C-alpha cells in the first residue's frame, strides 16, 4: 500500500508540471512586425458630408511645375522693370524739353558766330580784360558763365558784337589736332613691305626700340635719337614704313602733312605746332609723323610777303619744339618724310634735331620680286602668268607703280568678266602705267 500511495503521489506531481509548461507556452508573446514610423504631416481624415463635395482637391506641384512657376515669376519681374523704365522716361521727357529750351535761350544770347579770345585779367565778378590777336578789351562776363573756371590765360568765347564773355573753352587744343590723332593703329606691318631691310633696321633702332626698350639705351649710356627723316623718290615706301612702325608699337600716332601747318591768320601756324607737340606729350608714348616737310622746312631767305614770313615762323617754332625735348620727353619720336631733302634748311636736319637720314631708292630685281609677290598673293592668276617677265624689265619702277600695275591688271580682268588674271592683263597694265608716268612726269628731275 505504501508503494501504491507513493506511486500515486509521483504521478500527481508529473501532471502538475505538465500543466505549468502548457500555461507558459500559452503566455509567451507572438512576433509582431514593428509599427512603421510616420514621416511628414499627419494625414487628415477625409471629410464626409456636404462640405466635402465643394472643397477643391489639393495639387502637389512637380519639378516641371516649379520650373514653370520660376519662369513666370522672372517674366513678371522683367515686365515690372519695363513698366518702371517707361514711367521714368515719360517723367524725364518734360525735364529734357525744359533743358533744351534753356540751352536754346542761352545760344540766342550768345549769338553766332563767336570769336575766341584770351583772358588776360579778371577785374571783378562781372568784368574782365581779354585780348584777341593783339588789342585788349574791357568786357563784361555773362551770368551763365562758370566764373570758378575762369583764370588768366584760358581761352574764352566772345560775343561777336558786344565782345562779352559768353563761354569758356575747356580744351585749348585745336580740333584739327584731334583729327590728326589716329584712334586705331594702322593695319600695315613690316610684312607688307617688300625689301627695305636696311631701312627697316635703321628705323627700328631709331624709333621703335627706344619706345619699347628704353632701358637698353640707358645701359649703353647713350641718348636715343629724337627723330629721323625719310627721303627719296615718290612711291618708294616712306609713308608705308612710318605706318608699319606705328602698328608695331602701342604708341599714339599723330600724322600731319606739312601744308596743314600753313594757316591763314598770323600766329596760327606756330600755335598749331605747339599744340601738336603738347598733344603728343599728353598722349605719350607717341610718334609725330610730318609728311611733306618741305612745305614749311625750306631754306630761309629774305621773305617778300607776309605769307612767306609766316611760313618761316612756323619752321622756327618747329625747331624750337625739337630743341625743347628733354629726358622726360623721350617717349616722343618725330618722323619726317620728303621728296626733296636738298631744299630743306640745314638747321632742321642737323644732328641733334634729326639724328638719322634714311634714303629710299627705287627697288632692284630682288625687291621687285618681293613686292609683286605681296600684291599678287590674294589674286587668282592664270597659268600663263610669268612675273619674271615684268621683274626683269629695265623700267625704273617704284613700289607704288608696281602696286598700280597689279591693281590695273585686276581691273582689266573684271572689265572682261573674268575672275582670273592672265599675262596679257599685266602687259596692258604695265604699258598704261608707264604711259601715265611719261606723260605726267616732272621736268628737270624735280619731284612734285
Swiss-Prot record:
ATP binds at residues 232-239. It comes from the Eukaryota. One of its GO terms (cellular component) is cytosol. Keywords: ATP-binding, Cytoplasm, Nucleotide-binding, Nucleus, Proteasome. The keyword Transferase does not apply. Signal peptide: none annotated. The keyword Transferase does not apply. Residues 1-10 have a biased composition (Polar residues). The 26S proteasome is involved in the ATP-dependent degradation of ubiquitinated proteins. The regulatory (or ATPase) complex confers ATP dependency and substrate specificity to the 26S complex. Belongs to the AAA ATPase family. This is 26S proteasome regulatory subunit 4 homolog. It comes from Schizosaccharomyces pombe (strain 972 / ATCC 24843) (Fission yeast). The gene is mts2.
Amino acid at each position: 500500500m505504501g508503494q501504491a500511495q507513493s506511486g500515486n503521489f509521483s504521478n500527481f506531481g508529473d501532471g502538475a508540471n505538465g500543466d505549468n509548461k502548457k500555461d507558459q507556452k500559452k503566455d509567451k508573446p507572438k512576433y509582431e512586425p514593428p509599427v512603421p514610423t510616420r514621416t511628414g504631416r499627419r494625414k487628415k481624415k477625409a471629410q464626409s458630408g456636404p462640405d466635402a463635395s465643394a472643397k477643391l482637391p489639393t495639387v502637389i506641384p512637380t519639378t516641371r511645375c516649379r520650373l514653370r512657376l520660376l519662369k513666370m515669376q522672372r517674366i513678371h519681374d522683367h515686365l515690372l522693370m519695363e513698366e518702371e523704365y517707361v514711367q521714368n522716361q515719360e517723367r524725364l521727357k518734360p525735364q529734357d524739353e525744359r533743358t533744351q529750351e534753356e540751352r536754346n535761350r542761352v545760344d540766342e544770347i550768345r549769338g553766332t558766330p563767336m570769336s575766341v579770345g584770351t583772358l588776360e585779367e579778371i577785374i571783378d565778378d562781372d568784368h574782365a580784360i581779354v585780348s584777341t590777336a593783339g588789342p585788349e578789351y574791357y568786357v563784361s562776363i555773362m551770368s551763365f558763365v562758370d566764373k570758378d573756371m575762369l583764370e588768366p590765360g584760358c581761352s574764352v568765347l566772345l560775343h561777336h558784337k558786344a565782345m562779352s564773355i559768353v563761354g569758356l573753352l575747356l580744351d585749348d587744343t585745336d580740333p584739327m589736332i584731334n583729327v590728326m590723332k589716329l584712334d586705331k593703329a594702322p593695319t600695315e606691318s613690316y610684312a607688307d613691305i617688300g625689301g627695305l631691310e636696311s631701312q627697316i633696321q635703321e628705323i627700328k633702332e631709331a624709333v621703335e626700340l627706344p619706345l619699347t626698350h628704353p632701358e637698353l639705351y640707358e645701359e649703353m649710356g647713350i641718348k636715343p635719337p629724337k627723330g629721323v627723316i625719310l627721303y627719296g623718290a615718290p612711291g618708294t615706301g616712306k609713308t608705308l614704313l612710318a605706318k608699319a612702325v606705328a602698328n608695331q608699337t602701342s604708341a599714339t600716332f599723330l600724322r600731319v602733312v606739312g601744308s596743314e601747318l600753313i594757316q591763314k591768320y598770323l600766329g596760327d601756324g606756330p600755335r598749331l605746332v605747339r599744340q601738336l607737340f603738347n598733344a603728343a606729350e599728353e598722349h605719350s608714348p607717341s610718334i609725330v609723323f610730318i609728311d611733306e616737310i618741305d612745305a614749311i622746312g625750306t631754306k630761309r631767305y629774305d621773305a617778300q610777303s607776309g605769307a612767306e614770313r609766316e611760313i618761316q615762323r612756323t619752321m622756327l617754332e618747329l625747331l624750337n619744339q625739337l630743341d625743347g625735348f628733354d629726358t622726360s620727353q623721350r617717349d616722343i619720336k618725330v618722323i619726317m618724310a620728303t621728296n626733296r631733302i636738298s631744299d630743306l634748311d640745314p638747321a632742321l636736319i642737323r644732328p641733334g634735331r634729326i639724328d638719322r637720314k634714311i634714303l629710299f631708292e627705287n627697288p632692284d630685281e630682288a625687291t621687285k620680286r618681293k613686292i609683286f609677290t605681296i600684291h599678287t598673293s590674294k589674286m587668282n592668276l592664270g597659268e600663263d602668268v610669268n612675273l619674271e617677265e615684268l621683274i626683269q624689265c629695265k623700267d625704273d619702277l617704284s613700289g607704288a607703280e608696281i602696286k598700280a600695275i597689279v591693281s590695273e591688271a585686276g581691273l582689266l580682268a573684271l572689265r572682261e568678266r573674268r575672275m582670273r588674271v592672265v599675262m596679257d592683263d599685266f602687259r596692258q597694265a604695265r604699258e598704261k602705267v608707264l604711259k601715265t608716268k611719261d606723260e605726267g612726269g616732272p621736268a628737270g628731275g624735280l619731284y612734285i
